[in-house]
Amino acid sequence: MGKLKLLNTIAPAYFYAATVVTFALHFLLFTPTIFQSSDVTINPAMLAHISIFLFLMGNALGNYIMTIRNPSESANETVIPVCSPDCPDRIDAHYLLNGRHFCKVCKKVILKRDHHCFFTGNCIGNRNMRYFIMFSIYTSSSCLYSLVIGVAYLTIEYSISFENPLTFLTLLPLSTGYFFLGLISGLQFFLVIMLYIWLGIGLVSVGFCCQQLLLVARGQTWCELQKGQLSECRGTWRANLTDVFGSHWVLGLFVPVPTVETVPGNWQVYHDHKHD
């Protein structure tokens, strides 16, 4: 449990650091180099790049904040469950009743718990699932966009060719060797590492997004899937998606704002409210 709590502290710090570095690289290196023009200070291509980048990052950070600000904890629980040392449930959660779980990391009872997200430091459940999915979508988009811009910068600044599909398989090991031999600068080596970080985070976020969308459409949570259980509130895929994304889901695709009414405190009341 101590390792999980440590991870709960390290993961958000890693996210904040990666975000700051990404902003710095885009505005201090990538934008001035790739979109520079001798005629005007700011050209249409630069404005388009800045707009796209800020839109993607703004939505990623906005949904990240909304995921944290809308916890799925139960407001009606006054007694904190105590698990025995030989508790058969997973190490990070203990199943109670009616779709409720006690998270051993959060020390809270979570309504319709899906999983504990270490990057946000809280559990994903009925109230913040929409924001978590949109956070995953925009995080993957931001990272993959940064990957493309980073490749363009390395091509322009260091004449690295990415025409060969095998370049990504050899770039990191070769750059590591060249760096320790003193053949490339620390900045170039750092940028190569960032390419792989963006690629890794982007692909993982895409995987999370696809998994969560599938589970939401089936009306199932990750906790239920692991135990081979069907949802206690199973409905049609359209109703399940509406429960999470709301009737104004189109707005939520572009702006990190609430698009579904929730009745905090009790999942059964919330579910009955949504299906009245």
UniProtKB/Swiss-Prot annotation:
The chain crosses the membrane at residues 10-30, 46-66, 132-152, 166-186, 189-209. InterPro entries: Palmitoyltrfase_DHHC, PFA4/ZDH16/20/ERF2-like. It is a multi-pass membrane protein. Residues 101-137 form the DHHC domain. Residues 1-9, 67-131, 187-188 are cytoplasmic. One of its GO terms (cellular component) is endoplasmic reticulum membrane. PROSITE patterns: DHHC (PS50216). Belongs to the DHHC palmitoyltransferase family. This is Palmitoyltransferase ZDHHC22. The gene is zdhhc22.
